[in-house]
Amino acid sequence: MTLPLLSVSSDRAVDVEADALVVAVSSEKEGLRVHAPEGLEFDADGLSDIGVTGGRDEVVRIAGTGTAARTIAFVGVGSGPVDAVALRYAVGSATRQLRGVAHVAVAVPVSSLVDLTAVLEGAALGTYSFDAYRRDSLAGQKPRATAVTVLAQGDSWTADDADEAVAHATAVAGAVAGTKDLVNTPPLDLYPATFVDAVHERTAGLPVDVRVWDEVALAADGFGGILGVGQGSTRPPRLVKVAYSPAGATRHLALVGKGITYDTGGISLKPAVPMIGMKYDMTGAATILEVVVAAARLELPVRLTAWLCIAENMPSGSAIRPDDVLRMRGGTTVEVLNTDAEGRLVMADGIVAASEEHPDAIVDIATLTGAQVVALGERYSAVMGEDALVARLLDAAREQGESMWGMPLPEEMRALLNSDIADIANVKPGNPAGGMLVAGVFLKEFVGRTGDEDDAPRIPWAHVDIAGPSHNKGGGHGFTGKGPTGVAVRTLLALAAGFSRA
């Protein structure tokens, strides 16, 4: 993970020496609008003649004649408002597509500190690449930018504010890139024990506490879901607790993440083609790890606890079978009718463990169901759970420009999970209807109460299914290239920041 060096300058765009100067262009009813920085003028009709439309993800380069820059790159911001979300997307699209430019200067309309931070984030996010396994790290392509300078003048922020914006953007982009790096790592190299190593590496020097349950401790403490899923592999499972508890924090947000380092489906084996890409099944755990890392770097005044539920789901003579019963943390028994519905089993243990600390809220995140992709496609995450918490998550996602959609948890679906011999079954075999919702209903069963009393209310809880948007299988868009997306990192950070102000 290498991020570009970010900086903010009040210099005039025309005077800045850079390999590329990024200028924003809008598509409006009246025609093309060039958001020209001070000291520069552009002929909108002339730009239209060479194919500039102002559409999103459009980047057109011309010679930097009349400026100190080598080239000028016009990036489209679309036809909507030129706000923080649009600017983050557009600038990220520019840095993702610009190659062979070591230093990029960005001169887009920045009217607030929020805009400035978003532009810095987008610039850093767009430069991501993963080349750890390539002989030629560039794969024949020119390198991306190593330095980005945002040119902005404003009366609403100080130099210290600009420095904080740079620090914030660096932490956020680092968290997204860290998530992508983990998800990109092949399962031969990333398995439960090495995932734990990565946790220690990412948290080194930060004010966080890490506790690890190995297979012996998991058995002693009754984590039957994580143990059951992992028992078919020669590489035993782990549960990792990463706790950030700053002095003075009055609110506690717990995060639970699915960390299946490879999902073959177990005895309920996946077909060959759908199995490709199942290294992505640990995205939830990687996401919450990086959220805590970023929160600690930013010194957010909120207590965060991440529960990484890590296992490898493999078929073998020791693997769990359909018809087996697992006893979960807390004592609930689960009849396993499909071993490929394993994510909910490890997550249930994590939710119970998180509940035992009586946090103010629990959010779990997982690449949980193929049904999520069927329902919402490959760019929208599903959110379900307690209404107020779901609303806060959706607001945070909207603020960050991440696509999430609220879904119901119908009470009548609980009956579909009735078991003849256990407290609950993990699936309803042969009934694909509402599969994403059924998984959410299953997880809800394990959410604890706000206190030790039997009649205490349930802890506010939300479930985020990122099965589709965790992986971009097509071409790049905005600051997101092909491969893992780091979806929900920014939303969960924004949610945590909101908790710190509550």
UniProtKB/Swiss-Prot annotation:
Record-given protein name: Probable cytosol aminopeptidase
Active site residues of this protein: 270, 344
Residues at which Mn(2+) 1 binds: 263, 340, 342
This protein's record includes keyword Glycoprotein: no
MF terms in GO: manganese ion binding; metalloaminopeptidase activity
Entry EC no(s): 3.4.11.1, 3.4.11.10
Cofactor note: Binds 2 manganese ions per subunit.
GO biological process per UniProt: proteolysis
Catalytic reaction(s) noted: Release of an N-terminal amino acid, Xaa-|-Yaa-, in which Xaa is preferably Leu, but may be other amino acids including Pro although not Arg or Lys, and Yaa may be Pro. Amino acid amides and methyl esters are also readily hydrolyzed, but rates on arylamides are exceedingly low; Release of an N-terminal amino acid, preferentially leucine, but not glutamic or aspartic acids
Similarity field: Belongs to the peptidase M17 family.
Compartments where found: Cytoplasm
